[in-house]
Amino acid sequence: MGMRMMFTVFLLVVLATTVVSFTSNRVLDPAFRRRNAAAKASDLIALNARRPECCTHPACHVSNPELCG
């Protein structure tokens, strides 16, 4: 293998390692889970606050069927 090919393989290994470690840290991190749950709750509260206008708007109604029943 030439130097260029070895360098390319090295970069691919580093990239793959970085991606795997980044995603596994996010999945296992309890603080990330709490932040994610808080963000989802905040989004749901915001959607409920605009429920009347969302249910009368066809595009919003289709995107959020759980709000309008």
From Swiss-Prot:
Disulfide bonds join C54-C60, C55-C68. Two 4-hydroxyprolines have been detected by MS but the assignment of which of the three prolines is modified is uncertain. Residues 56-58 are annotated as: Lacks the Ser-Xaa-Pro motif that is crucial for potent interaction with nAChR. InterPro entries: Conotoxin_a-typ (IPR009958). This is Alpha-conotoxin Mr1.7a. The modification 4-hydroxyproline is found at P52, P58. GO terms for cellular component: extracellular region; host cell postsynaptic membrane. The keyword Cell membrane does not apply. Keywords: Acetylcholine receptor inhibiting toxin, Amidation, Cleavage on pair of basic residues, Disulfide bond, Hydroxylation, Neurotoxin, Postsynaptic neurotoxin, Secreted, Signal, Toxin. Pfam families: Toxin_8. Expressed by the venom duct. It comes from Conus marmoreus. Belongs to the conotoxin A superfamily. The cysteine framework is I (CC-C-C). Alpha4/7 pattern. The keyword Disulfide bond applies. Negative results: neither MrIC, Mr1.7b, nor Mr1.7a inhibit alpha-7/CHRNA7, alpha-3-beta-2/CHRNA3-CHRNB2 and alpha-3-beta-4/CHRNA3-CHRNB4 nAChRs endogenously expressed in human SH-SY5Y neuroblastoma cells. MrIC does not activate alpha-3-beta-2/CHRNA3-CHRNB2 and alpha-3-beta-4/CHRNA3-CHRNB4 endogenously expressed in human SH-SY5Y neuroblastoma cells. Mr1.7b does not activate alpha-7 endogenously expressed in human SH-SY5Y neuroblastoma cells. It is found in: Secreted. Residues 1-21 form the signal peptide. GO terms for molecular function: acetylcholine receptor inhibitor activity; toxin activity. Residues 22-49 form a propeptide. The modification Cysteine amide is found at C68.
